[in-house]
Each structure stands twice: as C-alpha cells, then as structure tokens.
C-alpha cells in the first residue's frame, strides 16, 4: 500500500531558512533599508548546517536568515516609517524639480521620523543586560566623537556622541569606577566596573583622521544611531543611581571659579559643554547623601566560610584603597601630554588636575601653585624645575593605576628610558612566562624592595666573569679525582669476584654502607606509580584527551622556556655592553 509522495525541500531544514532576497521582497524594502532594519533589531544571518538542502540542491553562495526572524520583522512599526520616508524623498525630489519652494519647506517640516526606545526595551529587558552589551556602544561612540566635521557623517551625530561619552566619563569619575588602563597601538583601553559589571572600551588617540575608502560609513552610522539611544538611557539610569543631575550640571562653587575666564574661551551656548568636557570639576547632586560606612553583620560561621569572608574583606579593602590612589595629590599637565585621558584617569582616582589656562577651558589652578605634587611632562629640559614637586612622564600615571599603588618616580623622570608598559588584561597562569618587570611589580605589591636586585645581579656576573677561569680548572680537577676513585673501586670489586669464582668458594656476604630512606622521594615514586596505573586504566577516548592536554602543557612550557632564554640572551648582551662601556678608556 503506497503512501503519499513526499516532495523535496518542503520539510525539515529547508523550511526554516529564507534567502536575503526573498526576505527583502517579503518586507517590501530596499537592500539598504533591509540591512538597516536588521542592524537596529539585532537580526543576523545564519549559516545552515546542510547548506545544499536549504539552497534546494544549489551550491551558489547565498545569505540565509531564519524565517521566524523575518516574521518577527513583519510587525515592526519602523518598517512603515521606512516606506513613508521613501514617499517623502519622492515628493521632495518632485518639488525641487518643479521649483516649488513652499512645498519643499512644507515637506521638510513634516519629514517622517521614528524613535528607537521600544527597540532598546525589547532587546534589553533588564538594566544589567544593557550594561553587559555596553562595550561596543561605548567604543563606537568614542570613535564617532573624534571624527572631523566632514561629509562622512552628520554633525549632529558627532555632537551627540561627544555629549554622551563626556556624560559617561563624568559618571565613572563620580563613582570611582575605573579599574584598568592600557595604552595600545589602536588607542587607550579602559575598564570600569559599573554595578558589578566589567565594561571595557577603547578610545582613539586625538590624531587627525584619514578616512579609509573601504569602510561603509552608512552601516557604522546605523549602529551608532542605535548605540546613542542605548547610551542615553544608560547614562540617565546611572546618574539617578548617584543622585546626580541629568543633564549634568557643574557644582556652583566650581561654576563660580570658571565664570571669571568663561568669556575668553567660548560663546554662552558652547561654554557649558566645554566646561563639562574639561573633566576638572565635580557634578552637582540632587540631594547630597550623608556618607555612612555600612558595616556588615558578623555571624558565627565555619572555618572555611570564615576564610572566604576574610579574603573577600581584604579584597574590598584593597579596592577601596585603589579608588583613593591619587587622593591628596595635585597634578599639573603640560601642553604636550594627552590632556583628556590623563584628566579622566587622575580625577577617577581622587586626584586634582589642572593645566595652562591658554590650553583649554576648565583650569582650576596655575602652574605656580605651591600645592602641586606632580607635573606631567613629555619634553625634557623645557622649563625650570620647581622644588617640592615631581616631574614625571605620562606613563607613570597609567602604570600606577594598573599596579594599584604609587610606583617609584625615578624610572619615569623626563629623558629617562621608560620601563615596559605591561598589559593589565593579561593574567599569567602556572607554567607561563613571566617577564622580570612583572616579577618586580609583584614584589612591589607584596611590599618588598626590589631596587637592588639588578645591582646584585651585575655584581654576581662580574664576580662570575673574574673567577671563570679558576672555576673551570677546579671543576676539571674534581671530575678527574671522582673518575679515578670510581675506577679503583670497580677494579677492586671485579677482582674479588674473579678470585671467588676461580677458588670455587661460595659468594660471601660483603659489608655495605647503610642507606637512609628518603621518605619524600618514596612518596613521589608512589604518586607517580599511581598516576601511571591510572593512565593505563583509562578508556581510549579519555587517554587521547589526556594526551592532548599534556601535549598542550608541554608546548606551553617549551614556549615559556624559549622566551626565558631569549630574554636571558638579551639581558646578557645589555650587561656586556654596559661592562664594555665601563672598561672603555676615556
């Protein structure tokens, strides 16, 4: 008895996907509008597991979307706005062609617009979800805020991104939320902890832009359109959590200090934004909260739980100390250093910062202030040093933040070769190569003084070089003596055995030396034997996986040893060069 004939590609995975062209026709949108809608709604293409089945036997390259995603887009109200905008462009073009200027003005006044608020709420049901997805939004907004006012993107978008990023930086300063900073080739990486969520973003350096031609700025502008809406909501909620005014306002005392020099910098319409962007003044609060230290209740607990709580308490104390790293210090920035990045970092850790009044609005004190403790310079020998303050290069600020302590300033004086700038985002595991600079930093964090390590190493190298010849001779003599003694013992033992064999006597028990058992070595041997037996009892798949893991560990150890050898060779070359310079006649 025959069944119904089954047709190909009418069930299974072939019915779960749809090509981009079919989806676009279903929505009645052009390709740029379809792409824009997918970006705003967070709909992305999918790669089917069986592409040939989905493509109905064809092997042509096509982009596929899930049908349920396209059905989800059918009910989006923005689709109608896109259609209205298409009609608006057609009418506007016709009015321009007929030179009907009244109609042109009327159409521009009634230009269709839309909001993305409902999409933000739809994509991020909770505030924590929005914070977890804030990395890309911040990076894109910081990038657009540095763009010049060219035809690549709208001026309003650049100004909006600048305002939102300045607002977020002010929140980080007020909440003391900054944790890590790293200078890279791409830009400056920041990590802030906002409501327990780590947020990492990158801010480009303040260089002139050379716009590449192979970048689609329309796609970037669409992402930025969504990200600015998201960041606006996030900033509003974050400011509410700290009882700060939103839009942000500068405190009345700082406002009065800046009022004296306001007219010389900008117009009234621009001065408030310039003052906010200076990052040198605190923000006004709705209600100033009373600072009370909340003490945790103590309950009788087990020993293990108590140890965990003690570790947690120490971690919180270290974090609070890190937040007040620059508290009580006054910095002055020279005009050649990156002002905004340094001001943001110093203010995030409780320090006071200022600069020359002719450089930017927002300077709070002059370079002649007697309370200045550190002056950040990047050009040696440009000014007369003032007693009572340290002159350091900008890297000192970044390294102090990552080290979580105030580093010695001797290695950061103007004109001095700077130490390597280590990344705080790298955490070494067991078996990894740890550079000597990181070991020195770890020693400083433990409270040790690694200042004389290099001198001791150099002295040891010098002593080793002086006694190198004598040591080689002594080692050779010792080896000859040991070899001679071992040969004599073997000859005596062999001759005794030969005499017993020839005499026909039974082998006698010979007196030996008592050997003490090494318990630690026996325990290691038992452990290695148990491990070997456990490996023998493994299944084939488990043994293969174990061998892969051990191979990876051995490879990591080999790479670490190779790096250590390279570093040792480099240090030896540098030491020999220094030694040659010392011994060279003047």
Curated annotation (Swiss-Prot):
PROSITE patterns given in the database record: BRCT
Localization, UniProt: Nucleus, Nucleolus; Nucleus, Nucleoplasm; Chromosome
Cross-link (Glycyl lysine isopeptide (Lys-Gly) (interchain with G-Cter in SUMO2)) at residue(s): 515
One cellular component (GO) term of this entry: nucleoplasm
Region (Sufficient for nucleolar localization): 1-257
Ranges where the record places region Required for 28S ribosomal RNA processing: 1-54, 537-586
Compositional bias per record (Basic and acidic residues), positions renumbered to this chain: 562-577
Sites of the Glycyl lysine isopeptide (Lys-Gly) (interchain with G-Cter in SUMO1) crosslink: 515
Residues recorded as bearing N6-acetyllysine in the entry: 98
InterPro entries: BRCT_dom, BRCT_dom_sf, PES
Record PTM: Sumoylated.
SUPFAM superfamilies the UniProt entry points to: BRCT domain
Main location: nucleus
Protein family membership: Belongs to the pescadillo family.
Protein name in UniProt: Pescadillo homolog
Gene for this chain: Pes1
């Amino acid at each position: 008895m025959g069944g119904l004939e089954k047709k190909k590609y009418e069930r299974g995975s072939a019915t779960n996907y749809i090509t981009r062209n079919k989806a676009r026709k279903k929505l009645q949108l052009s390709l740029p509008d379809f792409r824009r809608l997918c970006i705003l709604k967070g709909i992305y293409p999918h790669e089917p597991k069986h592409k040939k089945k989905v493509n109905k036997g064809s092997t042509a390259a096509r982009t596929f979307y899930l049908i349920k995603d396209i059905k989800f887009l059918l009910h989006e109200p923005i689709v109608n706005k896109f259609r209205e905008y298409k009609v608006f462009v057609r009418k506007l073009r016709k009015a321009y062609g007929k030179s009907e200027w009244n109609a042109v003005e009327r159409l521009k006044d009634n230009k269709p617009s839309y909001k993305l608020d409902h999409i933000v709420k739809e994509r991020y049901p909770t505030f924590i979800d929005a914070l977890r997805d804030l990395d890309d939004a911040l990076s894109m907004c910081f990038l657009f805020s540095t763009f010049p006012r060219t035809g690549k993107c709208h001026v309003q978008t650049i100004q909006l991104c600048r305002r939102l990023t300045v607002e977020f930086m002010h929140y980080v300063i007020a909440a003391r939320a900054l944790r890590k900073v790293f200078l890279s080739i791409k830009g400056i990486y920041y990590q802030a902890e906002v409501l327990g969520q780590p947020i990492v973003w990158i801010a480009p350096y303040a260089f002139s832009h050379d716009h590449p031609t192979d970048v689609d700025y329309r796609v970037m502008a669409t992402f930025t359109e969504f990200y600015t809406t998201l960041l606006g909501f996030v900033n509003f909620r974050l400011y509410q959590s700290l009882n700060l005014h939103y839009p942000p306002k500068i405190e009345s005392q700082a406002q009065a200090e800046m009022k004296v020099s306001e007219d010389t910098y900008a117009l009234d319409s621009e001065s408030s934004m310039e003052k906010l962007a200076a990052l040198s003044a605190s923000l006004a609060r709705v209600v100033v909260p009373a600072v009370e230290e909340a003490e945790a209740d103590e309950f009788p607990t087990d020993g293990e739980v108590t140890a965990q709580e003690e570790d947690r308490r120490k971690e919180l104390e270290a974090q609070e100390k890190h937040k007040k790293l620059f508290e009580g210090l006054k910095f002055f920035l020279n005009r050649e250093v990156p002002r905004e990045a340094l001001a943001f970092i110093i203010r995030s850790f409780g320090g006071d910062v200022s600069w020359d009044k002719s450089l930017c609005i927002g300077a709070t004190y002059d370079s002649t202030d007697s309370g200045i403790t550190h002056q950040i310079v990047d050009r040696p020998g440009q000014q007369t040093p003032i007693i009572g303050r340290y002159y350091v290069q900008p890297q000192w600020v970044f390294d102090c933040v990552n080290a979580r302590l105030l580093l010695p300033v001797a290695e950061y004086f103007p004109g001095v070769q700077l130490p390597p700038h280590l990344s705080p985002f790298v955490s070494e595991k067991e078996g990894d190569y740890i550079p000597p600079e990181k070991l020195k930093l770890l020693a400083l964090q433990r409270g040790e003084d690694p200042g004389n390590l290099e001198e001791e190493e150099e002295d040891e190298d010098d002593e080793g070089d002086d006694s190198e010849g004598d040591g080689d001779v002594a080692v050779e003599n010792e080896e000859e003596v040991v070899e001679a003694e071992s040969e004599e013992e073997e000859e005596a033992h062999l001759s005794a055995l030969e005499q017993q064999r020839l005499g026909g006597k039974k082998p006698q028990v010979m007196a030996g030396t008592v050997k003490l058992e090494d318990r630690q070595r026996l325990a290691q041997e038992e452990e290695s034997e148990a491990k070997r037996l456990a490996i023998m009892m493994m299944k084939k798949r488990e043994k293969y996986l174990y061998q892969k893991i051990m191979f990876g560990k051995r490879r990591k150890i080999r790479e670490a040893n190779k790096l250590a050898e390279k570093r040792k060779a480099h240090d030896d070359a540098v030491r020999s060069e220094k030694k040659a310079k010392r011994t060279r006649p003047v």
